[in-house]
Amino acid sequence: MSMIKLKKTYLLLIFVFGLSGFAVAQSAARPDIPLVRVYFHEKIDSTQKLIRKLDGKNDEFFKPADNEDLNNRLDKALTERVDSIQDAIESSKIADNNDKIRYLRGLNEALQRFYIGFKYQTVKSPVLLEVVSGYKNCMVLDQKKQSIFPEIKRHSYDAGDILVNAYAFNNNEGLQASKDFLTLKVCHEHPDRMMTILSKNPDFPYTDSLIVVAAHTRPDDLYTYAAAYNKFAERIRNSPDSLVQLIVRISKMPTGRMFFPFLDNLSKNKISFDEVETALKDDEKYYSLLVKTEIDYADRVRRRDTPLSIIALRRKLADKASEVYVNVINGLHESPDNIRFRKIANLSPEELYYLAVMTEDVIYTSSYTHGVYPFIWKKMKTAKGGDSLLLSVKFDYFRKWVKMAANYNTLDDFLKRMDKGNAQILMKAFVNGLEKSATLEDAVDVADSYASINDKAIQSLVMNQVKNNLQQANQTGNKKAENIYDILNTLFLSIDSSNHIDLSEKLGIPPIYFMPNKDMRDAKGRIIIQQFFYGDEDGRTFFPMFINSFRNANWKMQSNNQWVTISSTKGVPVTIYTNKPLDEKQGLDAQAQGALNQYLYDNDLNPTMVIHRGHSYWLPSTLDQLSDSARLVMLGSCGAYQNLSKVLQICPTAQIISSKQTGAGNINQPMINTIIDELRQGKDLNWPVIWKRFGVLFNHGDLFNDYIPPYRNLGAVFIMAYQKEVMNEED
């Protein structure tokens, strides 16, 4: 209902007649609205308009979903049903004006909470249906002086939370019971939020019971809160539960975080505090103890017994693998192998195995191919010890191991180190049961690996196993498995061009075979490109080459102390912003990047192409600064192929060019120049055509063959396709 014209009418009548409390009929079919309540109706109208805009369409409807039926119901709830609640308030027999204002104000608050939640993606669109119907029912109960608790119990946590925080029900007799119910509900449905909620509500009736639950399910969180000095921490410390008390004891120790990975074995007296204390005196002994414990825990997980603090153990194992070993051998990448790999010479095959699988994102290609991988076989008692290695680690992280072997071109060698029958069983296991994982990581590992499998027999075996799993999922009605294996099947078939599969059309995702030039432009028709350089030796070497490649009539340059701006003089307006590779030891390169980021933000310059230049250890810094406006991301660094999922968390539909092994400056630069010049000329980026040209340019060399174009980034495509499928189902 629009109140803008009415407001002007009221002001005119007040001026002419000097009336207060004047009532005007909004229309023949709608109740009269006294002037004293017009403001509250207008606030509701304003919030309705804000919600309509959330779907990104400039119209009078709210249709945020892909499902037309859901869109119609959402739009009807926002307009007709909200209006009918306003009418019901005005036409009700409520005598007290303040009560009517209370309900109008509460309705607006509920809509505003939905608006904020949906805008910042903390609630989904169907919650609006619950909020509108729930508000109406709660209002009826409240008018009758009855508890709203029965109504709140009917709804999801998100809807219930919006309703109980509406001003209208502040004095309802069922408010506290409703809030307690919702607190229990969210703790059950979202255990990751339990400690945060309890810390804010230490007097919650079920706090003591939930503390014990947290000790068994979220021990890491309980450890953090137990070390604090507040009322909730006191409740934790006063718990009589033995496991809670063990966690409290560890939290009080200066080196408690180093003990925490062993919580389960400490609680079962399988290891003593003294044993851990002794290992702590030597980083290498501590790493060995972590590996030994991880294998023990992995065996228990295999037998469906999840140990306490396994997350903390794996986090610490990854930290120590990087800190004590991998960072060292990475840092010596220019030294002879006999010096470089001296640090890992005495490690067991199992300890070397965990160096690999725990440092996927940081280990250099050469650290893996020249060091960790061959050193494992030097330590094994038999050359054909592939299956023995996996048995010794209880098949822990075996999918990650297979994926890395595929990506680093050692999978064929690894599979030959076991009997053919065992190799086939392993690869079937690699593909099976992907739906059982809580995350998509295993499925993405399978997707990433397939194109790197060179053995046609193994590739065929994996393909057939995917088809078998898809058929089984269809027969059993397992929707998650069906989605995973249907997408994998489509991806793997698409690799053979004779199948003529258009992944974008088949999977319902944005184009991956080409990037339209218009999609790279901002509202002013500009293409903004940001490039990250780092101030190490590589950065200082390749930066001048980059600058010199644009010294021609098509470009002009400007420079300050921290960055260079390169702008096109012909064709589409393209501007490249690249920070200077200032001294990384003094942090000057990071300062330059920060200053450039601020400049781009202040001037409303949103990069649609982002280029990372540097080693893989710099990549986390680039990703931390990655703009969510990016449509094309180029990761020309060693190991960058492992970071696709991180990019897609920030830019869900970005196209990605990456290297699965060694990114090379002499390949990066010609690629960058070609792509940018295509954009300057107003051309769409046709990836198959461009990649064919690159193949000729680089003579299909090994370094070039490790670069992955957007339409071959199967892991990235899998994530996009799966997220799209889940969104469609939710709608």
Language model regions located:
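Bacterial Sec-dependent N-terminal signal peptides
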Residues: M1-A29
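Long, solvent-exposed N-terminal ectodomains/accessory regions
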Residues: R30-V402
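Functional beta-strand-loop-alpha-helix junction segments that form "active/interaction loops"
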Residues: A65, D69, S92, Q531-F532, ...
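Non-catalytic propeptide/linker segments at domain boundaries
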Residues: W377, K381, G385-A553, M557, ...
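Alpha-helical scaffolding within the catalytic cores
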Residues: Y513-P516, S559-V564, A595-Y599, W618-S621, ...
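Extended, charge-rich low-complexity interaction segments
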Residues: D583-N603, K683-D702
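Catalytic cores of nucleophile-dependent amide-cleaving enzymes
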Residues: L600-L685
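Caspase-like cysteine protease fold
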Residues: W687-D731
